[in-house]
């Protein structure tokens, strides 16, 4: 029997356009592999659409809120439909950069020093006074992030104290808490992880942005960033990063796939920045490049993710 796979894409988050590109690429790959595939643009009628299509498995190609945060995973659990990627808890934890940082810190894994600043507390203190205090306590430069956003949405780099208030306001447009992190200069490296109970790290990628910052434009515009495989760091450091990435994957309880982003400082020390449980699968995305470097072409990668989802389903239902 041919497996019918529903590609869940689009959605309602700020990353809708990226999700549509990922979904289209996944859909085409499934067709190449002779799966019976159907595209489902996730909206308020998603339950009706899923039931109507009578899918055997959901391939989650959603990014951001409602797709990566455990929401759609919980819905699929209730509908008893197998799905690709991490479960409810791991998805929710990885989507919240603040929660991820706390777990990484608890596990004793390296991550840049950080501070969580609640909007209500910042406004009570006054945004200006809060900004001055943050810069005084943490020093400059800093990175301010909206914890639950992806694709660098709501993120700012702060090099001057007078820019901190605006950075906080931007983060608060998306979340009630801002994650303020020490900005570490160095080499950006990402580790793509594939597997369930025995995950493996694919070849590492060094990211070099044309603008110096791997922002939304650099991520999704052809020619705006270079993916260097292998990274221009010693093999010993590469192996250490791979081990850290797998440890992070396991600590959060991820499965199927994830991408762990690092910064390597000038002394060669790696720091974990964040975890992405549904990495982009567009023409400019990192995960497919890492798979290709490991000898896995895109259609084969997509089929492998379907197989991992079915394997996990079997594990859960023993």
UniProtKB/Swiss-Prot annotation:
Signal peptide: none annotated. Its main location: cytoplasm. The keyword Cell wall biogenesis/degradation applies. Its cofactor is Mg(2+); Mn(2+). Its EC number is 6.3.2.4. Pfam families: Dala_Dala_lig_C, Dala_Dala_lig_N. This is D-alanine--D-alanine ligase. The gene is ddl.
